A protein has these predicted regions:
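N-terminal, Lys/Arg- and Ser/Thr-rich interaction peptides
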Residues: 1-31
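Interfaces that engage single-stranded nucleic acids at replication/repair/recombination sites
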Residues: 2-3, 18, 130-139
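Positively charged, aromatic-enriched nucleic acid-contacting surfaces
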Residues: 31-137
């Protein structure tokens, strides 16, 4: 697929944000993943559903499960991703289930994209594309 380079190239460093205090790993905001999918010319669909559990005796949204399907004229793949809610948000009235679901869905979306290879450098720590890594290995 000619769009693989456009789709799967590492995100430019200026889009990468530092992890908030107490969090692991730098990140790229959700909107940039959507822009990358849109601009690469692939078609995709996204489905997300909340995950419920009981917290302090109340039924609460504690996470999200998302499924992304990516096409390039042919079916390329379907990938799942999960996002969770920080426990402190469940105890804080400032954070409701709606805002918590939004955050969990964003994480689920980015994790599902990562399974395909989009943004994987943020998880692996590598900023080289496959082509660059192969060329470097050949010397």
């Amino acid at each position: 697929m000619s769009n693989n380079v456009d789709l799967l190239s590492p995100f430019p460093q200026e889009l990468v944000r530092k992890a908030p205090a107490g969090k692991f790993g730098d990140y790229v905001p959700h909107a940039h993943y959507v822009e990358r999918l849109r601009d690469s010319g692939v078609k995709y669909s996204w489905f997300c559903e909340p995950i419920y559990s009981t917290y302090n005796g109340e039924k609460r949204i504690v996470g999200a499960k998302g499924i992304i399907t990516i096409h390039d004229g042919e079916h390329m793949g379907t990938y799942e991703g999960f996002g969770d809610i920080d426990t402190f948000k469940l105890s804080n009235a400032k954070f409701n289930d709606g805002s918590n679901l939004k955050d969990a869905e964003s994480d689920a979306f980015k994790r599902a994209c990562m399974r395909f290879g989009l943004g994987v450098e943020l998880w692996s720590g590598s900023t080289q594309s496959e082509e660059e890594a192969t060329a470097a290995a050949r010397g």
